[in-house]
């Protein structure tokens, strides 16, 4: 099997899935204490970098996604599949797991 080179530009989500670049988590507490990786909360905010074509309805038509590339979103804590490309972290999740668009 040939090796596949993954990059953000080669990932095309299917159906109602979106590919989100995870925002960096806090390294320190408000009091200045450095947090080890095991104590950090999983980030729930990120920027959409790719969007699938949308969910298929019962009649076969596509439902347009409510989000677009560049939107900053808040998503469910345990949603999606975590993916690391180089030094950046991403999550591939279903549009239904997005809770809000952050202005």
UniProtKB/Swiss-Prot annotation:
GO molecular function terms noted in the UniProt entry: ATP binding; metal ion binding; protein folding chaperone; protein-folding chaperone binding; unfolded protein binding
Principal cellular location given in the protein's record: cytoplasm
Highest taxon above the source species: Bacteria
Described function: Together with the chaperonin GroEL, plays an essential role in assisting protein folding. The GroEL-GroES system forms a nano-cage that allows encapsulation of the non-native substrate proteins and provides a physical environment optimized to promote and accelerate protein folding. GroES binds to the apical surface of the GroEL ring, thereby capping the opening of the GroEL channel.
Family: Belongs to the GroES chaperonin family.
GO biological process: chaperone cofactor-dependent protein refolding
Name of this chain's protein: Co-chaperonin GroES
Membrane-crossing residue ranges in chain numbering: none
Pfam families per the UniProt record, alphabetical: Cpn10
Species: Cyanothece sp. (strain PCC 7425 / ATCC 29141)
Gene Ontology, cellular component aspect: cytoplasm
Alphabetized SUPFAM superfamilies for the sequence: GroES-like
Keywords: Chaperone, Cytoplasm
Compartment annotation: Cytoplasm
PANTHER family listed in its UniProt record: 10 KDA HEAT SHOCK PROTEIN, CO-CHAPERONIN GROES
Keyword Transport recorded: no
Assembly notes: Heptamer of 7 subunits arranged in a ring. Interacts with the chaperonin GroEL.
């Amino acid at each position: 099997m040939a090796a596949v080179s993954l990059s953000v530009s080669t990932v095309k989500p299917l159906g109602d899935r979106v590919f989100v670049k995870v925002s960096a988590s806090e390294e320190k507490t408000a009091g200045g204490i450095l947090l080890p990786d095991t104590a950090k909360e999983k980030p729930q905010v990120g920027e959409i970098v790719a969007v699938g074509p949308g969910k298929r309805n019962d009649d076969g038509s596509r439902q347009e996604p409510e989000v677009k590339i560049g939107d900053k979103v808040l998503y469910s804590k345990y949603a999606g599949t975590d993916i690391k490309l180089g030094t950046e972290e991403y999550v591939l999740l279903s549009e239904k797991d997005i809770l809000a668009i952050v202005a």
